[in-house]
Amino acid sequence: MSFRGNSRGGRGGARGGSRGGRGGFGGRQFQQGPPDSVVEMGAFMHDCEGDIVCRSINTKIPYFNAMIYLENKTEVGKVDEILGPLNEVFFTIKCAEGVKASSFKDGDKFYISPEKLLPIERFIPKPKVAGPPKPKRKRAAGGAPGRGGFGGRGGSRGGFGGRGGARGGFGGRGGARGGFGGFGGRGGSRGGFGGRGGARGGSRGGRGGKRF
């Protein structure tokens, strides 16, 4: 997750001279260096185009761009993609400078800060709770009768249905990268994590057909 910080440059210009000492970004301080503790996140499966493909061994879901470490807190790279259904999650690591994906072997474990994990319940659709019934409007006594009610333009146009999104999943960026396929496209299986290509959610939720 990346945030763009608009530094509002160009507004100060000439003002900056007389108001010296105000520079720098100030405010938030971001954590530098490794975290205080790390937990197991994934096991190495194979390398692909310079990235590491892992099988998750954690019950939680990692943040995108979260830093991945070895057990001794040496940086390996960042989480790039999340793939597969919720009960069998895979993810890829974009290697840091100087780290080679081919240098690892099957079963090698990778670690993550516990602060960079989300509970899987965050991605499971919650059942809708029925609210209290709406009170009926009372007709005003006397006066001119209503205009007959126009029917609301065809009953809310038939409920277009979403754009094929993965209900409760990330709809990640994986897909046809020579080995990542097969875990579902954008809008793949319900509650899963999509790939980086694939059909866009079943041609966008039934957009075609004849127009009348």
Curated annotation (Swiss-Prot):
Q: Where is this region: Disordered?
A: 1-32, 124-212
Is Transmembrane there in the keyword field? no
Signal sequence bounds: none
The name this protein goes by in its record: H/ACA ribonucleoprotein complex subunit GAR1
Q: What does this protein do?
A: Non-catalytic component of the H/ACA small nucleolar ribonucleoprotein (H/ACA snoRNP), which catalyzes pseudouridylation of rRNA and is required for ribosome biogenesis. This involves the isomerization of uridine such that the ribose is subsequently attached to C5, instead of the normal N1. Pseudouridine ('psi') residues may serve to stabilize the conformation of rRNAs. The H/ACA snoRNP complex also mediates pseudouridylation of other types of RNAs. The H/ACA snoRNP complex mediates pseudouridylation at position 93 in U2 snRNA.
Report the family membership. Answer: Belongs to the GAR1 family.
Q: Which organism is it from?
A: Eremothecium gossypii (strain ATCC 10895 / CBS 109.51 / FGSC 9923 / NRRL Y-1056)
Ranges of compositional bias, category Gly residues? 7-27, 143-206
From the UniProt record, which GO molecular function terms apply?
box H/ACA snoRNA binding
Instruction: State whether it acts alone or in a complex, and with which partners, per the record.
Output: Component of the small nucleolar ribonucleoprotein particles containing H/ACA-type snoRNAs (H/ACA snoRNPs).
Q: What is its main location?
A: nucleus
